[in-house]
């Protein structure tokens, strides 16, 4: 008799409460019980981790670029003005002790909380974060904007700044960051080389 009453009680309880938390994942009160919460809609907050890559390139490569640029510059000046620059600028000064290898190091510079302000047609999250930091006695406001794929959001609701598409970093209202900050154009190398001649 006792077994029958327990069975009837279980049947009665399941008929009154027919839902299960395993089948009701779509309901807000049961959502993310077993999953990790990540930013997914407008208004959600995530953390952007800004890393600095210190790329110590080999001096041998740098000297080869300088030598090539000097040769090009010397040929242009020689053809245009008839002056041989090799008499004035030493080209073969790449001593063996200056030829070192290179390595890449990465370190966390800052973490900025960002808010999802929009979702583009492809499902990417448009984020914007602001942070005010004190440098000496001055305050500087940093604004980070960009798009994040939901798959790039890591555990802890963080995303690496290198994963931001169409990214912009503003400091005190001035744009200071382009899409590929570590990539130096050929024009930048020429300007850096010419500046190095006069310093």
Swiss-Prot record:
Keywords: Bacterial flagellum, Cell outer membrane, Membrane, Signal. PANTHER family: FLAGELLAR L-RING PROTEIN. GO terms for biological process: bacterial-type flagellum-dependent cell motility. Belongs to the FlgH family. It holds the Pfam family FlgH. It is found in: Cell outer membrane; Bacterial flagellum basal body. InterPro entries: Flag_Lring. Residues 1-25 form the signal peptide. Assembles around the rod to form the L-ring and probably protects the motor/basal body from shearing forces during rotation. One of its GO terms (molecular function) is cytoskeletal motor activity. The lineage of its organism: Bacteria, Thermotogati, Thermotogota, Thermotogae, Thermotogales. The basal body constitutes a major portion of the flagellar organelle and consists of four rings (L,P,S, and M) mounted on a central rod. It comes from the Bacteria. GO terms for cellular component: bacterial-type flagellum basal body, distal rod, L ring; cell outer membrane. This is Flagellar L-ring protein.
């Amino acid at each position: 008799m006792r077994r029958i009453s327990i069975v009837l009680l279980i049947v009665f309880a399941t008929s009154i409460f027919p839902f299960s938390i395993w089948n009701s994942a779509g309901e807000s009160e049961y959502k993310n019980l077993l999953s990790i919460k990540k930013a997914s809609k407008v208004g959600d907050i995530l953390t952007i981790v800004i890393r600095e890559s210190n790329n110590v390139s080999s001096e041998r490569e740098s000297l080869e670029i300088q030598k090539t640029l000097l040769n090009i510059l010397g040929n242009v000046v020689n053809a245009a003005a008839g002056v041989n620059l090799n008499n004035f600028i030493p080209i073969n000064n790449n001593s063996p002790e200056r030829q070192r290898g290179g390595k890449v190091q990465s370190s966390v510079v800052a973490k900025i909380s960002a808010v999802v302000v929009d979702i583009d047609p492809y499902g990417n999250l448009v984020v914007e974060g602001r942070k005010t930091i004190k440098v000496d006695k001055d305050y500087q406001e940093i604004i980070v904007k960009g798009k994040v794929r939901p798959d790039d959001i890591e555990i802890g609701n963080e995303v690496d700044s290198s994963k931001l598409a169409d990214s912009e970093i503003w400091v005190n209202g001035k744009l200071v960051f382009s899409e590929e900050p570590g990539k130096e154009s050929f024009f930048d190398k020429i300007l850096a080389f010419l500046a190095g001649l006069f310093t």
